[in-house]
């Protein structure tokens, strides 16, 4: 019946774009939000947008003064007799780009949960200027993301103050926003144990009196770590989220970003296991010290490589 997708970066001669064109030619209603301000991809995005428009796809172009960085898709279905069928939502940390997909490590959630489907539909209507945004499940930058992040951090501070052990693990590409960094410093001072896995720029300084409970890990390996995954302990009832934004001012305040909670217990456990594996890595991981220098972890002689142990398991 209907397909809605955001396009931030796609490969040249994209199989994704070709599939959307085929869907439109087969009578499906297809809407694509094209971000023309994606740096270095402006020309390719404009060319693919014109190609899709010529095939009958509805194209929505960039919002002035605002980037849409969310990586999302929605499929709404009806049966042959018009009856409603389950709809599907997809929320990812990476672009719909088969070229970078061979080089980047990302995560995506494909779900038919109604609360996520409904929120994503509201997001697409918002991008078309048709809806006052109301999000009950998704966290969306410029709307409810910052208040929810503050609430989640405050919850861990409350647990630490009660002696119940606040715990936060954050995996991202970059950590730069001063307000969120100060929130993490405050949580550390209250005793919240915080692990950060930050591949790129990190403006938080570990190893200080105000950050003594914060440890920063960096992993550079065969694939570019691109996933954004956030874990909040919540008194042994963990809340896990994944989505498109890094904790940079541009992502949190000047872009449309989408983050989903991971509600399925098995999927949540898989992401927690991934975080723990990366925190335990003793082959490619390094610490970021108080001088913001990379200090590679040293394996004790005789200690096996965590990566080898996992690959042979």
Model regions: which residues?
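Pre-Walker A segment
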Residues: 1-7, 148-152
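PLD/PLD-like phosphodiesterase catalytic module centered on the HKD motif
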Residues: 26-100, 110, 115-117, 142-313
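Acidic/polar active-site rim loop that often engages polyanionic ligands
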Residues: 102-105
